[in-house]
Amino acid sequence: MEKVVLAFSGGLDTSVCVKLLQEKYNMEVITACVDVGQPEDEIKKPEAAAQKIGSDKHYTIDAKDEFAKEYAFRCIKTNSLYEGYPLSTAYARPLIAKKIVEIAKKENASTIAHGCTGKGNDQFRFEATIRSESDLDIVAPVRDYNLTRTEEQDYAREHGIPLPSEKIYSIDENLWGRSIEGGLLENPATAAPEEIYEWTKSTVDAPETPQIVKIEFVNGEPVKINDEELEPVALIRKANEIAGNNGIGRIDMVEDRIIGLKSRENYETPGAILLITAHAALEKLIFSREEIKFAENLSQKYAELVYNGLWNEPLREDLDVVNDHMQQRVTGTVEVRLHKGSMKVITKESPYALYNEENVSFEDKGIDQREMIGMVKYYDLQGAEYSKVKRE
């Protein structure tokens, strides 16, 4: 009997997939859950659920450190935001797929399975990475059988699959952020209720006193918060805690999915927003004007590649090479004031700063103003010629 490794969360979709793979595909099912910073119970529950449903074997893979260092920190270094969102779900998918491939190779499996539907982004993200990392077959039972939510529930009851507790919202959570969708949130005319948020306080409940956060960067990566040196996972968690407590990081947006659907999405990404904001401010102190323009274009393109699941696209690796070189100078300290949902960079310093106080001072003669006369005279020469042509 051939083996299949199923990316397993313990939710309805992947729970139904276990039985479908055994019944419809006649395969030995190995389930695997990859820990990228989910709540502890979301790591423990899949193992118990897999055993109850009848998985032949289960793996739990701790990938938090790799996710923080190689993926979340890459988001910071590139300031990558897709339509204003720091890609907490999208950055996790290629790592999860990579770990599933590693298990499949270890088990000599012929196939990898996932529980994605045919309407979402994750089918593209998972399968693009799986195909780049291996020649294994891929199946997606829920999509392949075109199952609705109700049909999945009926199938689960018929096959004795314990139904997960009914949730109003679909929630995906990892170290870098939480995404909340479904239920009444599907109507963009309906305000998101306070109950959906767990990481962030409302502006009403946030502290009355502003908090100043000091973040130190080395080569573009955050290394200290408030002078405390922290490993990547701990640093991100600290940033989430501080920013979330001050009402930072709520995003309510209508997002353009890969297949063209518009989807109402709610996110909590307090630490990501704080760290990216501080990092971008430091870059503006250090980079030249042309570097800043280029970095903005790089950020947008990088975010598109990650969102679209193109982690193994050669261009992404090319951009990493350029970005890593630029980040060698992004070393310094930034202070950010947080207060009731607002965030403002108040100080920044770096040994690589291109800012020259002497040159910009109103009191200092670092630059002889008279030398500007000739430069200003011919500034916008083409604009002047264009206006002359119009007049004639």
Curated annotation (Swiss-Prot):
UniProt KW keywords: Amino-acid biosynthesis, Arginine biosynthesis, ATP-binding, Cytoplasm, Ligase, Nucleotide-binding
Residue positions binding L-citrulline: 85, 121, 125, 170, 179, 255, 267
InterPro entries cross-referenced by the UniProt entry: Arginosuc_syn_C, Arginosuc_syn_N, Arginosuc_synth, Arginosuc_synth_CS, Arginosuc_synth_type_1_subfam, AS_cat/multimer_dom_body, Rossmann-like_a/b/a_fold
Gene label: argG
CDD domains according to UniProt: ASS
Localization terms from the record: Cytoplasm
Annotated Pfam families: Arginosuc_syn_C (PF20979), Arginosuc_synth (PF00764)
Matching PROSITE patterns: ARGININOSUCCIN_SYN_1, ARGININOSUCCIN_SYN_2
Catalytic reaction equation(s): L-citrulline + L-aspartate + ATP = 2-(N(omega)-L-arginino)succinate + AMP + diphosphate + H(+)
UniProt GO BP: argininosuccinate metabolic process; L-arginine biosynthetic process; urea cycle
EC number, UniProt record: 6.3.4.5
Name of this protein: Argininosuccinate synthase
PANTHER family registered for this protein in UniProt: ARGININOSUCCINATE SYNTHASE
NCBIfam families: argG, PRK00509.1, PRK13820.1
Enzyme class: ligase
Any one GO cellular component localisation term in the record: cytoplasm
Residues reported in the UniProt entry to bind ATP: 7-15, 115
Binding site for L-aspartate: 117, 121-122
Subunit composition and interactions: Homotetramer.
Coiled-coil portions: none
Natural source organism: Methanosphaera stadtmanae (strain ATCC 43021 / DSM 3091 / JCM 11832 / MCB-3)
Pathway involvement of the protein, from the record: Amino-acid biosynthesis; L-arginine biosynthesis; L-arginine from L-ornithine and carbamoyl phosphate: step 2/3
GO molecular function: argininosuccinate synthase activity; ATP binding
HAMAP family: Arg_succ_synth_type1
Family listed: Belongs to the argininosuccinate synthase family. Type 1 subfamily.
